[in-house]
Amino acid sequence: MGRRSSDTEEESRSKRKKKHRRRSSSSSSSDSRTYSRKKGGRRSRSKSRSWSRDLQPRSHSYDRRRRHRSSSSSSYGSRRKRSQSRSRGRGKSYRVQRSRSKSRTRRSRSRPRPRSHSRSSERSSHRRTRSRSRDRERRKGRDKEKREKEKDKGKDKELHNIKRGESGNIKAGLEHLPPAEQAKARLQLVLEAAAKADEALKAKERNEEEAKRRKEEDQTTLVEQVKRVKEIEAIESDSFVQQTFRSSKEIKKAVEASEVKHAATTSGPASVVADPPSNEKEIDPSNIPTAIKYQDDNSLAHPNLFIEKADAEEKWFKRLIALRQERLMGSPVA
């Protein structure tokens, strides 16, 4: 009998629950939506409570208490309905929020990251600036080369035009003159051109002589350096003996004096023959000249002033011929 009564009680209880659910399903749907929007913070608590109630093992005492509450007061049923409707509404709002968050995450994933984009754009812009700067430098170099070439071409053209203009001006200037004066003017121009050519040749010879002299000086400096090194080695050696100092200038003067004496003896009578000066032999200090000697013949004027007039004119004529040859042929006058 106890079992049958408990079965009937359970059936009646399940029927009541179904009725309550049907009634509350229509009325509480709108309330649950508004209530879930206002109070979304209590969702986790009600959910945990409902889950804990469902998971707890049901006993006879728990069933009796529940029956007593439902039969004694209808407030519990209304509270139950409200809590269920709230949990449903909250579940819907949670689903909506979750779907929104998922869609946001999908959008954020689908969108390219701004940092990576900015880095790639910075790299590409850096590469572009590098390539642009290189192109600018290349263009500048090409422009400079073109300008230099144009300047050189302009200078060559100017020189060519100047030469042409000079020849044209000469011809135009000589046209109005008589033939004799034209010949004189042309001869004068030829002489000027020859003089310019002679000056150019002389300058070339001077440059060559200077180059030779520099080479000789370099060679002499090398010889002097070797001699200096040997002298230093001799001084540093143990067999070195200190001697009195003699300057090289005095030795050079003595050599020059001996050369002058040798020239004087050769110009004198042929019977007198002087020995050639030897640089290796030591020169006596008595032979070194200490004063300047002048070759004075007690003459008040130069001997050319005492030449006859015909001889002087002849010499002057020869001098003019030599100068003319120098201007025409470019050969230097002796």
From Swiss-Prot:
Its BP terms in the Gene Ontology are: alternative mRNA splicing, via spliceosome; mRNA splicing, via spliceosome; nucleocytoplasmic transport
**Annotated region (Disordered), positions in chain:** 1-179, 201-220, 259-284
Q: Where is the composition biased (Basic and acidic residues)?
A: 1-13, 51-62, 132-166, 201-218
Q: What is its main location?
A: nucleus
Record field: compositional bias (Basic residues) = 14-24, 35-50, 78-118
The name this protein goes by in its record:
Serine/Arginine-related protein 53
Give the residues annotated as coiled coil.
180-225
Q: Which InterPro entries match?
A: SRRP53
Q: Which organism is it from?
A: Bos taurus (Bovine)
**Keywords from the named record:** Coiled coil, Cytoplasm, mRNA processing, mRNA splicing, Nucleus, Phosphoprotein
- Assembly, per entry: Interacts (via Arg/Ser-rich domain) with LUC7L3, RBM39 and RSF1.
